[in-house]
Design a protein with these regions (language model features):
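Nucleotide-activated chemistry modules centered on ATP-dependent adenylation/adenylyltransferase
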Residues: 2-277
Length: 277
């Protein structure tokens, strides 16, 4: 979500509409979560005087990802959705909408995989060259890391609810998975209150979420995790610097200390030599 928001704020003067897809990160069977996310996105669009468009699609359900993985994993395609489908899949859903609405530009959210030169299902050399009718696809922030995008959003001083979690079935953030934890830590590097950005920690303490880092637990498995790994390294460096200067993160103090102290190399299957620090 940080990607979409950073791009929105940079280009909002000419954007006419915001499109959200039901059936991508939220399964078609989870209507309750979709309604929550859709309401939030519609409210965001309304505040910024933009049209809100929602699309419902079974473009993930029609594929057997297990069979695709069995067939193509040996060729490096461990996840069909991530490595191949999602870029052109999203653009394919937006294409008929853009023609019907008369839009001549589509702004497509980037991912930080570009920065590390990894094979990925969304890339400027593919997305940015995709055209139909009189519509062109624009890609920006392609060289920004996820941490840089979060930093940009925080410095706008307009707190919004981010959604980085794929595990929470209510449409929010579980605050206990790797994706949530690293984004909470990223917000702390900018002295931002994670609760103001949608990380609510209902009924749990921030430091208790780090229980997922147990001896022998594998957190980083393949080169597809490289962007996450580098985000963790950058976050740790900043937090260590702040803590060394006596920073006080309030109820997140223990959380920040534990994040800064983690030995990330302990959570790899095999730490690639070029990742070693």
């Amino acid at each position: 979500m940080s990607t979409q928001l950073s791009r929105f704020f940079q280009n909002r003067s000419w954007l006419d509409a915001i499109v959200t897809v039901y059936g991508a990160d939220i399964d078609l069977g989870n209507r309750k979560a979709w309604q929550k996310v859709s309401r939030q996105n519609a409210a965001f669009a309304r505040i910024h005087d933009k049209t809100y468009i929602s699309v419902t699609s079974n473009f993930k359900r029609i594929l057997n990802y297990s069979n695709l993985r069995k067939k193509f994993a040996k060729k490096g395609l461990w996840c069909w959705w991530s490595y191949l489908q999602h870029g052109l899949g999203f653009l394919g859903l937006v294409a008929p909408i853009s023609v019907a609405q008369g839009f001549d530009k589509v702004l497509f959210a980037s991912t930080d995989e570009y920065v590390y030169g990894l094979p990925w299902g969304s890339h400027p050399t593919v997305d940015g060259l995709t055209q139909w009718s009189n519509t062109e696809v624009m890609t920006e922030c392609d060289n920004w890391t996820r941490l840089e995008k979060i930093r940009y959003i925080v410095r706008l001083r307009q707190p919004v609810s981010l959604r980085s979690c794929w595990r929470d079935e209510t449409g929010g953030n579980c605050c206990v998975c790797r994706a949530c934890i690293v984004d909470v830590a990223s917000l702390l590097t900018e002295d931002a209150n994670p609760s103001a950005y949608g990380y609510l920690f209902d009924g749990i303490t921030p430091e208790s979420t780090l229980a997922i880092f147990k001896p022998g637990t594998v957190m980083f498995k393949s080169h597809a995790d490289e962007p996450d790994y580098h985000q963790w390294l950058a976050v740790q460096e900043i937090l260590r610097g702040k803590l060394g200067k006596g920073a006080d993160f309030g109820k997140f103090q223990r959380f920040a200390v534990k994040i800064a102290q983690l030995r990330l190399e302990d959570y790899f299957v095999d730490l690639p030599p070029r990742w070693q620090t």
